[in-house]
Amino acid sequence: MDNIEQRVKKIVAEQLGVAEADIKNESSFVNDLGADSLDTVELVMALEDEFGMEIPDEEAEKITTVQQAIDYATAHVKA
């Protein structure tokens, strides 16, 4: 089973059409990876599906980097 970091990066790569090798933990979805507002919504939905969690809108707005997504998933993933 992949760890959370690998799973988050795989989702980001699939959703944003970027190579996993180009995704760094500090990468900003918008500034570094070229996401627009629709991309970020779809990314949050994909993370919710992958990890079986719900991310409230006010929390989703705070997730702007790969590391923040990893941290959120780590803290909220259902075992």
Swiss-Prot record:
Pathway: Lipid metabolism; fatty acid biosynthesis. PROSITE patterns: CARRIER, PHOSPHOPANTETHEINE. It holds the Pfam family PP-binding. Residues 2-77 form the Carrier domain. The modification O-(pantetheine 4'-phosphoryl)serine is found at residue 37. It is found in: Cytoplasm. Gene3D superfamilies: ACP-like. Coiled coil: none annotated. Keywords: Cytoplasm, Fatty acid biosynthesis, Fatty acid metabolism, Lipid biosynthesis, Lipid metabolism, Phosphopantetheine, Phosphoprotein. Carrier of the growing fatty acid chain in fatty acid biosynthesis. This is Acyl carrier protein. It comes from Cupriavidus necator (strain ATCC 17699 / DSM 428 / KCTC 22496 / NCIMB 10442 / H16 / Stanier 337) (Ralstonia eutropha).
